[in-house]
Amino acid sequence: MDRMVTLAHKFLAEVVSCGDLALDLTAGGGRDTLFLAQRTGAAGRVFAFDIQKEALDRTRSLLEEQGLRASLLAERGFPRAESGIFLVKDGHERVGSYVRESVKGAIANLGYLPSGDRSIATRTETTLQALAETLPLLAPGGRLAVIAYVAHPGGRKESEAVSALFRDLPSDGWRTMKTEMMNRDASPFLLMAERV
């Protein structure tokens, strides 16, 4: 079976293309940022958020290995409408301080940085705020994918809250779906939303 990240990428690949604006709300190791950068191409823009310098360093290294260059945004503000990959050392809950334009695709891979400090993880309150700021940015047909993990401290509460947010989106403006492994305790699951 495909991993949740692979499914999330397939879901976003259907709508994110060259020249689009896309968001990685949790840069982590950089795989999602790289995927979005490859989809949006040289004419597109990707913003990748993380509070950890280590995560942004890993992301930058992965991008450079693939011949891609990223710029670090040192302070809040709206960069000119130039193309590129922008690494933002700030919480994902402040996405609205950096992005005001229509977004074609966004992804959040919740939890902690793999092989990193497990005490630093996404939190329910900031994740809900990040999603509340991201959803209105999505263009018609735009999509959001969230991979939720329940096994780390606070993960179950966060996962349940994000699931409730997706479930409660009005059906006349959104299509939502949840994909999960049913016979594995505490396995990650994927939440997907599309603006109609």
Feature annotation, model-predicted:
Residues 43-49:
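Short beta-strand element of Class I
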Residues 52:
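Conserved SAM/SAH-binding beta-strand->alpha-helix loop
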Residues 1-21, 25, 31-34, 38-39, 56-101:
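S-adenosyl-L-methionine
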Residues 17, 96-107:
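A short acidic, Gly/Pro-enriched loop at the edge of an enzyme's catalytic core
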Residues 137-148:
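Conserved beta-strand signature within the Rossmann-like core of class I S-adenosyl-L-methionine
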Residues 107-130:
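Mobile active-site "lid"/loop adjacent to the S-adenosyl-L-methionine
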